[in-house]
Structures are given as C-alpha cells and as structure tokens.
Amino acid sequence: MKERYGTVYKGSQRLIDEESGEVIEVDKLYRKQTSGNFVKAYIVQLISMLDMIGGKKLKIVNYILDNVHLSNNTMIATTREIAKATGTSLQTVITTLKILEEGNIIKRKTGVLMLNPELLMRGDDQKQKYLLLEFGNFEQEANEKQENALYLIIILSRTSIT
C-alpha cells in the first residue's frame, strides 16, 4: 500500500473478538506525526501568566491575545489605544505591560509589542525558531536606535556650540 497524507501501511494483524472468538484480519495503518502548520499555546506559561495578573489587567492581556498578528506575533498599538479599547486606565495598561515585560511574555518598542512565541504562535518549527530570534532581537534593535539617536544629538550639540 502506498503512503498517503502521512499514513503508512505496516502490514496486517489477526485479532480475536473476545466475545465471539471470531478471528478478524485488519490492516495496520500509522500516521506520521508531522510538525506542520500549527498554533501552539503553552498551557503552563498561560496559567503562570494568569496567576501574575488579575481583574482589569486580565482584560488587557485578553485584548493583546485577541489582537496580536499571528504571522509575526506583533501588535501595533499605543498604550492609550489599548486603554481606550479595553476600558481601563492608562496607568493600568502601563503597569500590566511592565509586568508582562518583566515576565518575558512581551517585548516593546514605541507603539509595537511582540508576544513571546513560546507562549503563542502559528506555524511550523522553522517559523518558531525564526520568531524566537526575532523576539530576542526585538528590544535590542529599539535600544540601539535610541543610543544612536542620543549619540547624534550629542555630536550635533557639540558642533553647534563651536
């Protein structure tokens, strides 16, 4: 028998019905486990996140989970937009995002946040590796741009003084 859609024929086997004693010939078919396109939600991390957060903060987390783009695990929104959409205060949003950052659940740049792909993602193993690299570099890029901007300001201020 030919392999089809990950199913492999492994021969036949005789089974005996315990009640009737009838011998039944059956084909043994197995399906290969593939790591194709999937959405992974890691329950342990989700539960630990929910333990850290409660009430209105949970509303913010749900908003993030509902609005994150699963193609790249990012969400474009300011803290004010999140506060307005969730009906929570700006301070609650800021506090919640800080808790999520400290728990390595999200990383932020101005107006953009990225959800840790170990928590939730859609794709295969290759995409998970790619998103994990992106998550690791996400904050670093923003810090480098900020440092470069400060360096330029210092240089410009020195040249305008002389």
Swiss-Prot record:
GO terms for biological process: DNA replication; plasmid maintenance; regulation of DNA-templated transcription. The keyword Hydrolase does not apply. Keywords: DNA replication, Plasmid. Gene3D superfamilies: Winged helix-like DNA-binding domain superfamily/Winged helix DNA-binding domain (1.10.10.10). InterPro entries: HTH_CRP, Plasmid_replication_RepL, WH-like_DNA-bd_sf, WH_DNA-bd_sf. One of its GO terms (molecular function) is DNA binding. Pfam families: RepL (PF05732). It comes from the Bacteria. This is Replication and maintenance protein. It comes from Staphylococcus epidermidis. The lineage of its organism: Bacteria, Bacillati, Bacillota, Bacilli, Bacillales.
